Amino acid sequence: MKETMMGSEPNPAVARLQSDAPRRVATALIVLVLLMVTGKALNTYLGLAYPWIVLPFAAGALLIQRAGIRKWALPALLAVALVGFAAWTGNQFQDATWDGNMYHKPATVALHEGWNPWSAPEFIDWARTRDEPYYARSIWEGNDNNKWVSHYPNLSWLFGAALMDTGFGWESGKALSTVLAFALFLYGISVLTPMLGKRWRAVVGAMLLATAPTLLAQAATNYVDGATYAAVALCVLACLDPQRGRIGNIIAWGSLIVMAGLKFTGALYGALLALPFLLLRRPSWKEILGWAMLGAFVLSHPYLNHLVSGLPIAYPVTGNNKVMENQAEPSMLEGNRAVTLARSLFAHTSNTFTHPGLKLPGAVGPGEVDAAGIPDTRYAGFGPLFSLAFCITALAILAATIKRRERSDQPTRLLLTLIGYLMLLTLVHAAPWWARYVPFLYIAVVLALLGSWRSPSLPARSLSIAGMLVLAVNVGLVMQGVHRYTHQAAVESAADVDAVVKQHWRSDNTLIVQAPQFVGFSAVYHFSKVMEIDSVQYQYVPLGSDSCGIDADRGYWIRLVRVCQRTP
């Protein structure tokens, strides 16, 4: 009997390949993230002491008691070690992005220092009660970013604040993307092994999923689109998981809560992905109710808080605030979504506001590699070679399903239906041309290539291998761009400035940071708290209008802040 696109039902040999070890570690990672954010929410909203530490230990002890120490002790320890490693690594360099410094990092620090969004729904009201220099009125009064700190979904901030409470630095919150990438890779191995028939093939597929350009480009930042992608991919894998057990459901439920807590569009994605999950996994009503209650508490701010306050549930994204305004030329903002998606997919990789023009798939023009490493690349944001991989994927899936018998078995129908659904979801967002908003497209391409890899059709298999090789080279180009961006923004213009300040600092000096308001908090916090400089003053200047004058110029920190040193 010939193989179908998805392969036949798993035989005992394949079942043995599907080790539970990767699945358990992935589950432990998701559970640990949920326990940390739930614990920090209990601490923040209800004032309970140290629940972000007590909950993981209590859950671990209960799990080991019921399931046995041999099955879960090592996965739990590995999960803790991976979270610690990701947090330590993330804290070694600065997040130099606008969004990270505008609201992600200030909100994380504020939650760590006692801000409760329920008792002080407007962040600035709480900031006015603080004496620290980074809450100064010169930074926050009239700062339009107050509304994002006050009202944006805060799961990543709760995670970062829990890490800070545990002793990690303020940059450790960016570890969430890395932790979810670990979970995605491990769970991918477990799910894809029976689908592809061989463990090494599953490792290849899991690696392609876990090294998506969006994840790579945002790993060194506090952006949450990469983490959203990982949560979406985990939920998709749960729908494909042949094991109908509790572990797969935990990963799916946890991923749905995480994506809804990362951003408002994540809540929309979660609702749309919950449909196939509920249809395929068929959890009990008791299970649904339990997870719904957990989600309602963890996500109570901002969603329930907004309902109680009479605000639109997704404020400030909804209402009079036009988030996408001026983010691209009108033809991209107002055009047909399928057309704008195609125009971006086959464009030069670029972060310009105007469309950079179309190119032949496979061509790599000047500046595209550098643009691919930027966290929020607008056009062709999945990398310079993704358009070529997309074209090859379309041919591979056509070759794999051209004969009726090769698409008629249940696993293949499930995969094709899910791929079609993901392509449809790509058009749900108002800006499908912006890669960071459409995680479904990349997942659909990878799954289509993996499915074609098991086709009995030689052309389909050959095209699949070619497509995966193109994706691998594309990942290499994106990583090169990420390295350049991170080195320039977080090393040359951050660590180097820190070294100069440390070398020349005297106790009777004053450090002056000149910057727009959106980065004022981060600059003052970094130099006063992290570098422990007693005298730090903030001076507002429009971007690009800074000048040290007669004071010593110590450099341009994260390419946004002029640092001056004044001597008496």
Where does each model-flagged region fall?
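Membrane-embedded, hydrophobic transmembrane alpha-helices
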Residues: 1-72
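Transmembrane-helix motifs of polytopic, lipid-linked glycan transferases
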Residues: 33-37, 61-64, 162, 172-196
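Membrane-interface alpha helices of multi-pass inner-membrane proteins
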Residues: 37-44, 205, 248-264, 270-277, ...
